[in-house]
């Protein structure tokens, strides 16, 4: 299901029957309708970014709900797909903060230790937040708790009210939180633009001796 270290740690936090319930849920929703991302990409964030290499967490809400967009990494779409509005604003802020990045696929961030996690890992076609509140919150809360228990600093990037509520789970003082309004067109002008999350994260990582992320890669 996930990278083995993630699996071993997460299962210590979750109820014993949780994975069985998740598999039953996935069997049902993928059999009865169109669901994104493709089933083999549901846990992609944890497969691409191992626990021991995670330096930054960027928490999204749920996957894109249009065809060919969602790929299992929050905010990321394939380069062949136009950037959705939130990703457009993320790239605009990145350009103002550090420099221009032309790729829409954020896999290279994930490969550098940026965990691109959605709070809800699946979505029905055309129904934003259609699976919210059903099965996923205990899982993604468990991921945050596992990171919180680490003895090496992690930078938690929380965009928007939903993500910012997860700050309550980050109780270990060695970690760092960068928060702002969501990059959605509805809220980006209320403080996301100008928040410089990328250079701020790199400054923290550099200070902690963890090495910077190449956000333009």
Curated annotation (Swiss-Prot):
GO terms for biological process: base-excision repair, AP site formation via deaminated base removal. It is found in: Cytoplasm. It comes from the Bacteria. One of its GO terms (molecular function) is uracil DNA N-glycosylase activity. It is an enzyme of class 3 (hydrolase). Its main location: cytoplasm. It catalyses: Hydrolyzes single-stranded DNA or mismatched double-stranded DNA and polynucleotides, releasing free uracil. Pfam families: UDG (PF03167). Excises uracil residues from the DNA which can arise as a result of misincorporation of dUMP residues by DNA polymerase or due to deamination of cytosine. This is Uracil-DNA glycosylase. It comes from Streptococcus equi subsp. zooepidemicus (strain H70).
